[in-house]
Amino acid sequence: MAADLKTADIGVYGLGTMGSALALNLAEQGFRVAVSNREADWIAPFLEEAGPLAGHLSGHATLEDFVDSIAQPRSILFMIPSGAPMDAMIDAVMPLLDEGDTIIDGGNADFHDTRRRAAAFDGTGRHFVGMGVSGGEAGARNGPSM
């Protein structure tokens, strides 16, 4: 399900409205972008609809393959619902990460959750960034406020 990319510059997990638009924006800027989604059947249609930008995108059905496809140190943008889904994702992805890797929570999380998550990363050698994304689908595709 992957394009012919060996190593992505960044990963975007979550191909809903905002995640898919951000992935296309990054690809349009020349970045090699690995993408994945909880429902893997969203990946192939996304790549098909990407048109010529698909050459900068690689789709991955499993979290393990997704993480492995990103150049180290990894930067992974999660565009998933805030709260419990993000906590569960952190638990799932942490064993797959290496020192120096960065997780970016692009959901609009409560700042208390962001502080708690960042504190949990202290001393792990991995990094957590809470980054809200504003501008809706058009902003995400053409120039979001982050």
Can you say where each PLM-predicted feature lies in the sequence?
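NAD(P)+-binding Rossmann beta1-loop-alpha1 motif at the extreme N-terminus of oxidoreductases
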Residues: 2-68, 72-74, 100, 129, ...
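Rossmann-fold dinucleotide-binding core
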Residues: 86-91, 109-146
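A short helix->loop->beta-strand "cap" motif at the edges of active sites that frequently abuts
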Residues: 98-101, 124-126
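Glycine/proline-rich, positively charged
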Residues: 81-84, 97-100
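Residue-level recognition of oxygen-bearing side chains
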Residues: 65, 75, 85, 116
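Redox-cofactor binding/interface segments in oxidoreductases and associated redox assembly factors
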Residues: 77-79, 105
